[in-house]
From Swiss-Prot:
Cross-referenced Gene3D superfamilies: P-loop containing nucleotide triphosphate hydrolases (3.40.50.300)
Family designation: Belongs to the NifH/BchL/ChlL family.
Keyword Lyase: no
Function description: The key enzymatic reactions in nitrogen fixation are catalyzed by the nitrogenase complex, which has 2 components: the iron protein and the molybdenum-iron protein.
Catalytic activity reported: N2 + 8 reduced [2Fe-2S]-[ferredoxin] + 16 ATP + 16 H2O = H2 + 8 oxidized [2Fe-2S]-[ferredoxin] + 2 NH4(+) + 16 ADP + 16 phosphate + 6 H(+)
GO biological process: nitrogen fixation
Quaternary structure, from the entry: Homodimer.
Protein name per its UniProtKB record: Nitrogenase iron protein
Top-level taxon of the source organism: Bacteria
Native source organism of the sequence: Gluconacetobacter diazotrophicus (strain ATCC 49037 / DSM 5601 / CCUG 37298 / CIP 103539 / LMG 7603 / PAl5)
Keyword annotations: 4Fe-4S, ADP-ribosylation, ATP-binding, Iron, Iron-sulfur, Metal-binding, Nitrogen fixation, Nucleotide-binding, Oxidoreductase
Gene that encodes the chain: nifH
InterPro entries xrefs: NifH/chlL_CS, NifH/frxC, Nitrogenase_Fe_NifH, P-loop_NTPase
ADP-ribosylarginine: residues bearing it: R102
One MF term in the entry's GO annotations: 4 iron, 4 sulfur cluster binding
Length: 298
């Protein structure tokens, strides 16, 4: 059996990280790979499309019902989805109470101790990336995830989050084996999006693994709680996810130690690509607008 690959998808909330990861993993399982998904997002939506169901019960909620994690069996928390993909959601506490990352730590330890990682080719962690706090950084910090894929777009906050995640990877890259596998751009149809994503990837000493075009069929599939791979296997969008899966499969050992940039450098990049206006441009536009309004009144 091939060496276990532990990958993680990180990204800003709402970027389409869980959708992208589940479609990619559905394509990987079609390639004959055995997969375990460990959802590390408090929304617990990392496995919904694979299971064709509402969010599955989380390790933390089941442990609370049973008394403790020690009272659980592996089959209590592990569900089997599309083409045999194993699914677990770590979960998080009630909003405003406790550390959401605690569920990640508890879950990974429980899964390892109970043999969930046996007989799989890939373990995939789906992780919230707005905050790289101790708990959410756990797959990186504890040397679990070896390849990190950052899902982003051409929007400023997605770029900012991607750079922050790169900082988190760098922090643990030298003490462990974690590497940045690359960036995955989920198209939002912003100006010069591909160029900007590609430029950021290069600045981070990485690469743009794939540019996933925006397509309504993704939402159609999601409404039916399915991946595009399952819902419309012959569609162009399913082909995009298969291409992404092939690229990730071929990317073993290709990860890099990232070189995060400063906020000033990020803003300079946005100015360079015309995404952010300089003060001079903004003032010139305002003056032109006022002149036009004055002419209309004259």
């Amino acid at each position: 059996m091939s060496k276990l690959r532990q990958i993680a998808f990180y990204g800003k909330g709402g970027i389409g990280k869980s959708t992208t990861s589940q479609n990619t993993l559905a394509a990987l399982v079609e390639m004959g790979q055995k997969i375990l998904i460990v959802g590390c997002d408090p929304k617990a939506d990392s496995t919904r499309l694979i299971l064709n169901a509402k969010a599955q019960d989380t390790v933390l909620s089941l442990a609370a019902e049973a008394g403790s994690v020690e009272d659980l069996e592996l089959e209590d928390v592990l569900k089997i989805g599309y083409k045999g993909i194993k699914c677990v959601e770590s979960g998080g506490p009630e909003p405003g109470v406790g550390c959401a990352g605690r569920g990640v730590i508890t879950s990974i330890n429980f899964l390892e101790e109970n043999g969930a990682y046996d007989d799989v080719d890939y373990v995939s962690y789906d992780v919230l990336g707005d905050v790289v706090c101790g708990g959410f950084a756990m797959p990186i910090r504890e040397n679990k995830a070896q390849e990190i894929y950052i899902v982003m777009s051409g929007e400023m906050m997605a770029l900012y989050a991607a750079n922050n995640i790169a900082k988190g990877i760098l922090k643990y890259a030298h003490s462990g084996g974690v590497r940045l596998g690359g960036l995955i751009c989920n198209e939002r149809q912003t100006d010069r999006e591909y160029d900007l994503a590609d430029a950021l990837a290069k600045r981070l000493n990485s690469k743009l693994v794939h540019f996933v075009p925006r397509a309504n069929i993704v939402q159609h599939a999601e409404l039916r709680k399915q991946t595009v791979i399952e819902y419309a296997p012959d569609s162009a969008q399913a082909g995009e996810y298969r291409t992404l899966a092939q690229k990730i499969h071929a990317n073993s050992g290709q990860g890099t130690v990232p070189t995060p940039i400063t906020m000033e450098e990020l803003e300079d990049m946005l100015l360079e690509f015309g995404i952010m206006k300089t003060d001079e441009q903004a003032l010139a536009e305002l003056a032109a607008k006022e002149a036009k309004a004055a002419a209309a009144l004259a």
